[in-house]
Amino acid sequence: AAIFDLDGTLLDSMHVWSDIDVEFLRKRNILKVPKAYSQALASLSFRETAEFTIDYFSLDEQPDDIMHEWNQMAIEAYSHHVQLKPHAKEFLQFLRSKNIRLGVCTALSQKLYVPALQNHGIFDWFDAIVSTDDVNKGKSYPEPYQLTAVRLGVSPEDCVVFEDIPEAVTGA
């Protein structure tokens, strides 16, 4: 089986989150996104990111409110603007032609990954899709990948994982 990350691996979407960071922080009169902040987010779940953001910037806000705001900004981008990485669709077609089971393991919420994959006509190509929200752990931990393997009906040892973040590779 093959398990794919979405942001930065199948989807050319990393700019979406940096754009959201800039706009979100600008609304709070924080005019520069610190590099250390951006780097710390790489393998966190969506909720962990909201909690980290509150702590990092000492915001008097609730994680659910922040996640809702981010979701509204991101739904627009993922539904209409995010493109597949070059040759991603062809590679997935090739794997499907070899009867290789396909899975997704992503930090994206269902509200974002469904429209992104549907927009490119590949949502139904995946035999299993797991979000870090399903296990409440980021991708630096093995649990998201283990659940993806279970849902694919294969042992983790029989999976190849495609990731772009070193911490996530460690988790896999």
Model-based region annotation:
Residues 1-98, 111:
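N-terminal helical cap/lid subdomain that shapes the substrate entry/recognition surface
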Residues 4, 162-163:
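Active-site flanking residues adjacent to catalytic metal/cofactor-binding acidic residues
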Residues 8, 171-172:
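Residue preferences within the helical output face of two-component receiver
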Residues 10, 84, 102-105, 137, ...:
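Conserved SAM-binding loop
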Residues 35-36, 64, 105, 127, ...:
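Residue-level detector of family-conserved "landmark" positions at structurally sensitive sites
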Residues 81, 109-160, 166-170:
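Substrate-recognition "cap/lid" segment bordering the active-site pocket of phosphatases
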Residues 96-103, 145:
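Short, conserved structural micro-motifs that define repeat-unit consensus positions
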